[in-house]
A protein has these predicted regions:
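Transmembrane alpha-helix termini and helix-breaking/packing motifs in multi-pass membrane transporters
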Residues: 62, 89, 148-170, 291, ...
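Cytoplasmic membrane-interface "Motif A"-like loop-to-helix N-cap segments
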Residues: 66-80, 294-308, 327
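Helix-loop boundary and gating motifs at the non-cytosolic
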Residues: 2-54, 230-260
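C-terminal transmembrane helical hairpin of 12-TM major facilitator-type secondary transporters
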Residues: 300-347
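Helix-to-loop junctions at the C-terminal end of transmembrane segments
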Residues: 56-69, 284-301, 387-388
């Protein structure tokens, strides 16, 4: 029996693993497929489907711990993710790279969603109400994974393309082979150090489809019986509409050629701007948002956070008009937009947590997060088609106009919060 009393043996690597494939799925895949020659409409549509496991989370989340232990799920999903990344590396130089890689990314996305749930569950089971240092370590390594995936991996791919004279498939293949090797080594590490809590199948209970649908139906009915549930749902679906539209197109705009209206950043420049400067801005915004909510409460900060989520999007409109060559200016614009998003996103999460408090709060929180994934998935799927139809500049104007949806959602959220306070 190994000594697992020290959570620092497995917690940092667990949350690094949690973040790494997620960012590869949502961000790096977008850069990859753009470099493979797909249109913006195709890239946005295909990669947005990777959100589906999180949209379907209410259907499978309650049953993960019933089937097996969290440790078992973590180790199973980690080897699947690692093998999937290695298989993607194998297929990228081949003639059938698109179909094969999409199928493998699809497998990895479901495994990643299951891994996220199991990792969070294990953290809560093992850590309990510990001091802030443990939470800080967890958050730091998740952010570090974002930096490595969105920054370093993309930079390495760009450098390999220079070495191999623009061979996109082979260069990205080497990146994914390296990623796969790292993930599989981490899987071995976790197999040694993640604590055993009980036999893997101590309470084996596989629910039938009818039982699953029945329980999800009951949970959903109780959710919508909450006062102002419709207002809250509209908030969850509309508050992040501008970000949903930007999530894919902002990446494509940065790396698309100038003849198509993009900035034409190289992978190395993109890794610096989005993967380093942007991630730093997102982290800073999140820290400031959490401190603001802690000191002033969500009702006080909801409007400022809604504005911070929308107004900084004008940075992309500025970039599309002036097309600066100075990487510092591009980095500053991305930094400001990400600070605003990180700051505003805190209000979104805190509203969901506040609204679902009470009976079945865990199940209702899962449902709320499914709405959150859906609020990004749907606009992102069609954002590429819209951008191709109107061009980048007009698209960013449309994004700013979509801020009206955020304003409406904020008004409904304030009404809901006031009504909730009045009932206390």
């Amino acid at each position: 029996m190994q000594n697992t009393d020290n959570p620092l043996r497995w917690l940092p690597s667990l949350y690094f693993f949690k973040g790494l494939p997620y960012v590869v799925l949502m961000v790096v895949s977008t850069v990859l497929y753009k470099q493979m020659g797909l249109s913006n409409a195709e890239v946005a549509f295909y990669t947005s489907w990777f959100y589906l496991p999180w949209v379907l989370k209410p259907f499978w989340h309650p049953y993960v711990s019933r089937i097996a232990t969290r440790r078992w799920w973590i180790l199973l999903t980690e080897i699947i993710i690692g093998a999937s990344m290695g298989s993607i590396a194998f297929t990228l130089p081949s003639p059938f790279n698109l179909q094969a890689s999409l199928a493998l990314f699809w497998v990895a996305s479901f495994s990643c969603a299951f891994h996220n749930v199991s990792a969070d569950g294990l953290y809560l089971d093992e850590m309990g109400p510990r001091h802030n240092l443990i939470y800080f370590i967890r958050t730091t390594f998740y952010r570090l994974a974002t930096f490595v995936a969105q920054g370093i991996l993309v930079m390495v791919a760009g450098n390999l393309q220079v070495m191999y004279r623009g061979s996109m498939g082979y260069s990205w293949s080497l990146v994914f082979y390296g990623l796969s090797l790292f993930l599989l080594l981490t899987w071995i590490w976790h197999g040694i150090f993640i604590p055993y809590t009980q036999p893997a199948f101590k309470q084996l209970s596989i629910p039938g489809i009818r039982q699953v649908l029945g329980e999800v139906s009951d949970t959903t009915k109780l959710f919508f019986r909450k006062p102002y549930a419709i207002y809250a749902t509209i908030f969850m679906l509309l508050f992040k509409l501008p970000e949903g539209l930007l999530s894919k197109v902002s990446i494509l705009f940065l790396i698309d050629g100038a003849h198509r209206g993009g900035l034409g950043l190289s992978p190395q420049e993109y890794g610096l701007v989005a993967g380093t400067i942007g991630v730093a801005g997102l982290s800073l915004g999140g820290i400031l948002g959490a401190k603001a909510i802690a000191h002033g409460g969500i009702k006080r900060w909801l409007w400022p956070m809604a504005l911070s989520l929308t107004i900084p999007n004008a940075a992309y409109l500025y970039l599309s008009y002036y097309m600066p060559d100075n990487i510092f200016i591009v980095g500053l614009c991305v930094f400001l937009e990400q600070v605003g998003y990180g700051f505003g996103f805190v209000a979104y999460i805190m509203f969901i947590k506040r609204f679902v408090m009470g009976y079945l709060h865990k199940a209702h929180l899962t449902l709320g997060k499914a709405f959150m994934a859906l609020s990004i998935m749907l606009p992102a799927m069609f954002s590429g088609f819209l951008q191709q139809a109107v061009g980048y500049r007009t698209f960013f104007i449309i994004v700013l106009c979509s801020s009206i949806a955020t304003i409406i959602a904020t008004i409904l959220a304030i009404i809901t919060l006031k009504a909730k306070e009045a009932r206390k």
